[in-house]
Curated annotation (Swiss-Prot):
InterPro entries: Flavoprotein-like_sf (IPR029039), FMN_Rdtase-like_dom (IPR005025), NAD(P)H-dep_reductase (IPR050712). NADH:(hydroxy)cinnamate reductase Crd is a heterodimer composed of CrdA and CrdB subunits, encoded by adjacent genes. One of its GO terms (molecular function) is azobenzene reductase activity. This is NADH:(hydroxy)cinnamate reductase subunit CrdA. Belongs to the NADH-dependent flavin reductase family. SUPFAM superfamilies: Flavoproteins. Component of the NADH:(hydroxy)cinnamate reductase. CrdA is probably reduced by NADH and then transfers the electrons to the catalytic center of CrdB. Is likely involved in protecting V.ruber from (hydroxy)cinnamate poisoning. The gene is crdA. Keywords: Electron transport, Flavoprotein, FMN, NAD, Transport. It comes from the Bacteria. Binds 1 FMN non-covalently per subunit. The keyword Electron transport applies. It comes from Vibrio ruber (strain DSM 16370 / JCM 11486 / BCRC 17186 / CECT 7878 / LMG 23124 / VR1). CrdA is formed by a single NADH:flavin domain, which is homologous to the analogous N-terminal domain of CrdB (51% identity, 65% similarity).
């Protein structure tokens, strides 16, 4: 599996980036994770089709090429960061590349709740008609007190959180396979479906 792992912040130092970097190493035998930084994207504005920034087009292409997307979000004032909202607005307004794309949400925060409100906010956004991502149900990875969650080598310290992450990622790989199969079968059915006017003799 090939996943695009989006760092949902423009902060230079981020435990959400550390979380994705850890996942990239830890799950390398199961999947390839490409980290993507949204900090270089321009703030969203309504652009004409021929004026969409190249950075946005590049992000859309990477999303399309990936089997699924992982988004790591911090929590600012009970919500996702403005820079992540802006990136999603670009996708919604232009390519809609997240439509039917399997998505896993994870998050780290300095507080005890581990970005739970931001993750709920992000789910609501990704479920909007213009994005319409395929969100893995009943799954949250909440890494609270994240400043103390990693050792100097960037390894996750808490064995219980590591086991939880292992289980969630295993389920996400299976979820990705299921969605890919479902969409493939739906495409075949659409191709094979004939309407009355198509079968009517001339």
């Amino acid at each position: 599996m090939n996943y695009l792992a989006i760092v949902g912040t423009n902060s230079e130092v981020s435990t959400n980036r550390m979380l994705l970097q850890f996942m990239q190493r830890h799950f390398q035998a199961q999947a390839q994770l490409e980290l993507y930084e949204i900090r270089d994207l321009p703030a969203f504005y309504e652009a004409d089709d021929d004026q969409v920034p190249q950075e946005v087009t590049s992000l859309s292409d990477k999303i399309r090429q990936a089997d699924g997307v992982i988004i790591a979000t911090p929590e600012y004032d009970h919500a996702i960061p403005a820079v992540l909202k802006s990136a999603l607005e670009w996708i919604s307004y232009t390519s809609q590349a997240l439509t039917d794309k399997p998505v896993l949400i994870v998050g780290a925060s300095h507080g005890a709740l581990g970005s739970s409100r931001a993750q709920a906010h992000l789910r609501q956004i990704l479920d909007s008609p213009e994005l319409a991502a395929r969100l893995m149900p009943s799954s949250e990875f909440l890494l609270g007190k994240s400043q103390a969650a990693f050792n100097r080598s960037g390894q996750l310290i808490d064995e219980h959180k590591l086991a939880e992450l292992d289980e969630i990622f295993r389920e996400f790989v299976l979820f990705t396979e299921m969605i890919t199969k479902l969409l493939s079968e739906r495409t075949i059915i659409k191709k094979d479906k004939k309407y009355a006017w198509q079968t009517r003799e001339a």
